[in-house]
Amino acid sequence: MAVIEKRPDFKVVIVGGSISGLVLAHSLHQAGIDYIVLEGRNRIDPQIGASIGLFSNGSRILDQLGVYKSILDLTEPLVWYDMLTGQGDLVRRDDSLRLIEARTGYPVAFLERRQVLQVLHKHTPDQSKILTGKKVVSVRTLADGVEVQCKDGSKFTGDIVAGADGVYSRIRREMWRQAKSDGGLKHLEDDVKAMSADYRCLYGMSYPVPGLRKKSLYRTFNKDWSFLVVVGKDECCFWFVFEKLNGTHKLSNMPTYTESDQAEFVKPFMKRYVSQGVAFEALWHRKTAATLAALEEAQYNHWTYGRFVCLGDSIHKMTPNIGQGGNWAIESAAALTNKLHSLMKTTRQPTTEQISDTLIEYEQSRQVRTKEVCTTAGFATRLEAFEKFWHRPMALYVVPLAGDMLVDVHCQSVAEAPKLDFLPPPELSLKQDTIFQAVQFDQQGPHLVSRVLRATPLLALCFAAFHCLEPTGSAVPANADTEAVRLAMLSYLGDFFPIQVIAMVESARRGNSMGIAGLWPLFGLTGYWGSTGYAVPVYFFLQYILSPPSRYAASDNRLVPTHYARSAVAATGVGYLLLVAYGVLSQQNYLAGYAYWYLLPACTAVVHPLFASFLTHTTFADRVQNPRADMKYLLLSYAISGVFSGITHVYTWAPSPWGLGNILLIAARLRQGALLLEEMGPEKLIQRHHILMLGGGLFWALLHLWDLKSTGRLKAGWFKVLGALGGMLVMFGPGTALVLGWAWREVVLARKTGPH
């Protein structure tokens, strides 16, 4: 790995040989920035029973630094995730941890914290720059730098001092002292009072325990306490026992514990279950190390002042329930190095003001993201301990039914994580189908505001339809049973078939779960009471603005469960047949029967799951092993619906509404109020509905293709796109053109984007 030329005229004094401190040292080395690490303990890797969970946001940076493989050799990737009640009853078991690896390229892994420290220390290019037994007692600001004094009397100078010295950071306190002396930070007292603890935790490690599966993570939820157990390499068990304290403790009365306190603490937990058949006592009797400590929480406003800067637990302390504390420390080390590297490109001898501005940029780049994760971690701790009355039903019933939603949230967060910008991204992060690979495209796409503005014509169609079309169920004349009306209805229903198939596919797509796509039947029912001319364009508008390509950055989120993909056309066909049969039996005229077709989305919403239930459900395996398993079924569904629409279009060519005269007539009449049934004729009314709905559909498809063009994923030029869709529109009608555009989108979204 190439190292940037050294600049010995700028030096960082890193206080703390923690994970954040050593990662910062490695990062600065790669950036060509001089440093020295001062660790207060006599060894870099003390054994205190602490473990660390590595997720992709931290692993990717370690990979850039060339140390990840050595760390990975000490772990065994996790696969299984069990959620249990305090009585040991299984709430949910899934392989979400394997799905995270499939999406990110990096496995979720646990190992001893000291093992990570050992690897980082071993791979340090110049170990003479890592000094132990150097407990810092004060920092003095000089005219052109800082002077750090240690307890043994030694002093070290540099341009800045970085506090990576943990939750009770000396550097943070020295920064506060300096700021208070200068009167330089607003609301400093808020930071001084920020730390608190509502929970305590006994954490440790144990030898293998019979009954605990390899590659598994167990969570047990109960009122006021919870367990977290992870089975790592060689079946070594890492465990946490969380318990709510009696009230909130601030820094002044933060509890501390001795080894004798542990024995008293564990008594009520010994018979409580950590898995379906294993009680905590099995872990306790096989423990190799354990520590009891308060779970401090703190989100500080000020991360830097002058030549001081903090990172890791010294400035963002979260509870360990989501396993992101160490990863966030690694992120902050990378983010700080990025800013310093950018500064070094402009000057090798920056002024105090330039240094201060750079460190403030680092602070601002991290605060929003860090506040979110600290809040999430604290919420997880409280949720698992049922702190609020609604936490129990949410943890035991809502979360288990949410499917892979938690994986979605996690992956969205890590996809936005910083890396070392001056080093190439590691190959593992850019392999086929990872979110890091896909996000390179999708970050270039349009933001929400521009998406709303781009989709505004769909709302204009809705407005036009609402004011210029009357519901088809009103004032049905006696002459509605004519050949012209029949052909107009047939043309309309032929083109509606692809829309219905597409809507059913989108409602079943994994990335659209709990989204607007699932409400398609409601938009159909709205049309029953009014007009699809204004109901469907609203659906198009909402679906577009809420479904950017990034929603499907994970390839399994593009996936449509195969049992739904295989049955979409059949369900739509049966829905058509049921409504045809109803119209025949009720002996309605064509126009009155037309109103019943607004029931089609609701009808197929019932038929589709019924049909799918008779087919093999392979989603659990497909989402990890074969996220393109649905493609042949989707393309077949699109082809069948396109052919059906094209045949009806050709058959009804003479009364087709897509002539220039009809379209110009609508434009002219929009200024004249409602297009009343009595004055235009029933077949014309159907045709106007047809134009507004299918015109919106074609524009909707073009918007999605526009997204793919703007992100660089669709390579075809606009001449080719518009030529293909326009040619299909002329020859086989709008329904066929629409489904062609949608199939094109499907192929692009499913295309392998990583190196292969």
Curated annotation (Swiss-Prot):
It holds the Pfam family FAD_binding_3. One of its GO terms (molecular function) is monooxygenase activity. Keywords: FAD, Flavoprotein, Glycoprotein, Membrane, Monooxygenase, Oxidoreductase, Transmembrane, Transmembrane helix. Its main location: membrane. Pathway: Secondary metabolite biosynthesis; terpenoid biosynthesis. GO terms for cellular component: membrane. It is found in: Membrane. The keyword Flavoprotein applies. FAD binds at E39, G53, R113, D313, G326. It is an enzyme of class 1 (oxidoreductase). The active site is at R200. Glycans are attached at N57, N246. Its cofactor is FAD. SUPFAM superfamilies: FAD/NAD(P)-binding domain (SSF51905). Belongs to the paxM FAD-dependent monooxygenase family. PANTHER family: FAD-BINDING DOMAIN-CONTAINING PROTEIN-RELATED (PTHR47356:SF2), FAD-DEPENDENT MONOOXYGENASE ASQG-RELATED (PTHR47356). This is FAD-dependent monooxygenase atnK. The gene is atnK.
